[in-house]
Amino acid sequence: ICACLVGSEMCIRDSSDTEQYVYGLEAGRILRKIHSIPAPATQEDWEIRFNRKMDYKIKKYVECPIKYENGQAFIDYINENRHLLKNRPQVYQHGDYHIGNMMIGRGGQLHVIDFNRNDYGDPWEEFNRIVWCAQKAPLFASGMVNGYFDDNVPMEFWRLLALYISSNTLSSVYWAIPFGQDEVNTMLNQAKEVLSWYDNMRNPVPTWYFKGYYLQYIDGIPFKLKSTFDFSFMKEYGTVFKVYDDQDSGNICFGTEKDGQRYFVKFAGAPTEQYGGDPADAISRLKATLPIYSDLKHENLIELIEAKEIGDGFAMVFKWADGDCMGRMYPAAYRRFIQIPINDRLAVFSDILSFLECVVSRNYVAIDFYDGSIMYDFVNGKTTICDIDLFRKQPCVNDMGHMWGSSRFQSPEEHQLGADIDEITNVYTLGATAFALFGEYNRTREKWQLSDKLFEIVTRAVSDDRANRQQTIRQFTAEWEAAQ
């Protein structure tokens, strides 16, 4: 069973950066195999054939009543670079090779479909549809180019691709007219975007292009790093089935399975791609979180099993918690989450209230607590809180100016150097979380899905004036429960 790469739960935009890039690499390698089939010897010379095609498109564009803003840049680039067509090879072409004609199998394999427009021509001309890929997923598009050329992309390719895209874009506007204004507007916007990528056709390398990640594999799972690192020690925790490599904290995380049990391993010490600091500092920070997880044990907090120095770094091992993160940075999971019944979301919020009451009762304050810290098991209806690494003991003062966390969940004092960060701050956090759960992050009455009374309570909680908020988590909880 396959799912289309766009427009499904396994949509490319819902994949991690690494997954998008790796799928692109595979798409490029598949295309290279397709292009291994030569064209018949009787095929018309490519230079003659494509020049005729471009002349026709220029003529139709000039006659078209609708013009692109600075569309002349496409024509000028074509006329200045026709010589690039000389002596180009010809091969079998898929004919419509782009992200919409690919599918992902249940096992994660990439498949190419819809060969009904197959043709013969310059293999590099086949990339002209990459415009659609780059608009939806630049990392996928970059991977496709890098995979095709084994990370050694010649400049001549970029110059020719710009020629082919110029030709293709010219024809799009007059092609769209019979389909109505919406289709015309789509092509006008696309042309504007293409011109921005190429600096009005002055730079043949588009701005969306990314030279790629350093990829490493563990148990067949790809992940990105700055440079190679020995993860052989991970065998101690079983087989890796998932890698989380997008953190900017210096940590990299793994889902593992051993003897029928699953674990979540958080490791510091590797040269992670998103982290700009010293791995030694990441190790120190991760070690400092150990007492936090020990002090704040709660039925909804992810369960810490062990922590130790290993593999020239430091690892914390947790019991695996099934579920999806409710954060908007995970679009597929978020869409599922906002569709669950209100009563289930109320139960999630009740779990969050209980956990934050536990936090303040043990003389801590929640910092960097946001939707990305909340997981929900859709099968068993269980809430799990994770990633509390930056919680602090009271008293706490803002010593950063702009503290760690998502601005959608942060109180004004979390942006004010020297301000107290305390239980009243976490009342604001609760209010912001309620708006995320029951208002789709919007703080207007129109979007609010519960009663007027509950809306008033939550609006007080997110007041910029600390004195107007509920002064304790317990006060907020009492008001919330009384109003339900």
Task: Please name every model-derived segment.
Residues 14-69, 88-90, 119-120, 371, ...:
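A cross-family kinase active-site recognition segment
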Residues 208-241:
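Juxta-kinase regulatory segment immediately upstream of eukaryotic protein kinase catalytic domains
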Residues 92-94, 99, 356, 360-377:
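Catalytic-loop of the protein kinase fold
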Residues 303-314:
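Short beta-strand micro-motifs within the conserved protein kinase catalytic domain, predominantly
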Residues 1-7, 12:
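Single conserved hydrophobic/aromatic residue that forms the stacking wall/gate
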Residues 21, 25, 86, 129, ...:
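Helix-rich C-terminal or lid/interface subdomains of diverse kinases
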Residues 241-243, 249-291:
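ATP-binding glycine-rich loop module of kinase domains
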Residues 90-92, 105-158, 388-413, 420-427:
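Active-site Asp-x-Gly
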